[in-house]
Amino acid sequence: MAQFYSAKRRTTTRQIITVSVNDLDSFGQGVARHNGKTLFIPGLLPQENAEVAVTEDKKQYARAKVVRRLSDSPERETPRCPHFGVCGGCQQQHASVDLQQRSKSAALARLMKHDVSEVIADVPWGYRRRARLSLNYLPKTQQLQMGFRKAGSSDIVDVKQCPILAPQLEALLPKVRACLGSLQAMRHLGHVELVQATSGTLMILRHTASLSSADREKLERFSHSEGLDLYLAPDSEILETVSGEMPWYDSNGLRLTFSPRDFIQVNAGVNQKMVARALEWLDVQPEDRVLDLFCGMGNFTLPLATQAASVVGVEGVPALVEKGQQNARLNGLQNVTFYHENLEEDVTKQPWAKNGFDKVLLDPARAGAAGVMQQIIKLEPIRIVYVSCNPATLARDSEALLKAGYTIARLAMLDMFPHTGHLESMVLFSRVK
């Protein structure tokens, strides 16, 4: 006769151990060793000892959380933001900026198997010129939440301040909250974006139901009183301009217009320095033909055109190609052309590529540029600058160039997002003669 037993829940006792942290990974986690295994502990810094509880134990590594910190690193800082540790935006406000830059540079050097030549950085606070804040109506309290997502969660942290935002945007937070919280449609708001352009401040409101005339009037009054350009987005395809003209920002002596939803680099200071250094590394000469792949609306393309004989910008998004052409006209640049192409196909067969290029710049998305590396090699440029927002795909794509006879001449860590785990970089490849 079969006997049945009630299942017993498997219990695991979290092991408490004492560790010494000897490194910081690029995500801001302390790194220690225990029983021959690497242990990652958020919140700890090198030279700190702590009692920690193991939360995840894998074959090659383990994760733990701090139970009690026993000592403090000389590079520990008091976080400026009251939401740090709960908000998912920043991971490293407890570490000095110098330590953050060293740990990211070390991670980049390991991946690229090459020393980092320099760190390109700007101000570590008040650098973000764009932010998207989630909105959520709470029926019980009839209040509107406005903020960023919690780390590893879809819950919203109700943000009152954010010291990495441009000061103009941070100062707007309580005013925007009060305005949106007074709308009849606050149950039907998705998110609000704030953008600080050279031309002024933008507010883009995503709403999921039609706005009443009273709500529209409130928003218009608010935009006028705060000097904002106001845009309404009833869905992902439609953008209604309520007030303001085409926004623009300055970049290396040029004026670049953009649509409120277009991608622009969040850190204006690092962007300026990055573009200037890219031009310097390419050593652009008056007779050069230069190719800019994944060119967007011309962030690199147009500055390149001020120095080269001709520049071709290639982009996969038609609207950005159109914006690049418009920006070339606005800046009086007649030696630059933009093309919409599928960059997974062989662009070297296009008529505009028949004369080849002396220099190439590429700035792909996180997926990298595996599909175009062989095309670049076929063009035989003397110098290549690769701008990357993902060091793993950069390392992968670099292998093709190294095998084709190029060498890494310069490697820079771009501190585009201080206090976060984001690591951006730029590499100069030179062809071996």
Curated annotation (Swiss-Prot):
Residues the record lists as binding S-adenosyl-L-methionine: 265, 294, 299, 315, 342, 363
GO BP: rRNA base methylation
Signal peptide location: none
Positions with a binding annotation for [4Fe-4S] cluster: 81, 87, 90, 162
Catalytic activity: uridine(1939) in 23S rRNA + S-adenosyl-L-methionine = 5-methyluridine(1939) in 23S rRNA + S-adenosyl-L-homocysteine + H(+)
Domain TRAM residues, every copy: 10-68
Molecular function terms from GO: 4 iron, 4 sulfur cluster binding; iron ion binding; RNA binding; rRNA (uridine-C5-)-methyltransferase activity
EC number of the protein: 2.1.1.190
Keywords: 4Fe-4S, Iron, Iron-sulfur, Metal-binding, Methyltransferase, rRNA processing, S-adenosyl-L-methionine, Transferase
Annotated HAMAP family: 23SrRNA_methyltr_RlmD
Family in the record: Belongs to the class I-like SAM-binding methyltransferase superfamily. RNA M5U methyltransferase family. RlmD subfamily.
Role this protein plays: Catalyzes the formation of 5-methyl-uridine at position 1939 (m5U1939) in 23S rRNA.
Protein name according to UniProt: 23S rRNA (uracil(1939)-C(5))-methyltransferase RlmD
Source species of the chain: Shigella flexneri serotype 5b (strain 8401)
